Amino acid sequence: MGIVGVGIDLVSIPEFAEQVDQPGTVFSETFTPGERRDASDKSSSAARHLAARWAAKEAVIKAWSGSRFAQRPVLREDIHRDIEVVTDMWGRPRVRLSGDIAKHLADVTIHVSLTHEKDTAAAVAILETP
């Protein structure tokens, strides 16, 4: 297996919280019903959990874009909804893809790590091929 892309993203939770539920923002169509449900089930702020998921989506896009260095982008700009962050019964995150990005990354394993510290959420994504 080989690493073909690495992406990282940081999100200011207070700034994200101001925008996440505003009509007309990019976030209104970004999260799947499952992601919104998981965030609302948590004991702390839903915005805190969604911010980490936004960071993960951005990290995956950056990892994929970096793997295509000097090549024309092939994904549309509203790809975020096709990147879903799910968790297993122990709360470990995993990325589930659909649509065009799933076709482009069909043979790629995506490793993702999310974190929150004070007012910041962050995520790292690593793309690996067999």
From Swiss-Prot:
One of its GO terms (cellular component) is cytoplasm. InterPro entries: 4-PPantetheinyl_Trfase_dom, 4-PPantetheinyl_Trfase_dom_sf, ACPS, Ppantetheine-prot_Trfase_dom. It is found in: Cytoplasm. It catalyses: apo-[ACP] + CoA = holo-[ACP] + adenosine 3',5'-bisphosphate + H(+). Its EC number is 2.7.8.7. The keyword Metal-binding applies. Its main location: cytoplasm. GO terms for biological process: fatty acid biosynthetic process. Belongs to the P-Pant transferase superfamily. AcpS family. Transfers the 4'-phosphopantetheine moiety from coenzyme A to a Ser of acyl-carrier-protein. This is Holo-[acyl-carrier-protein] synthase.
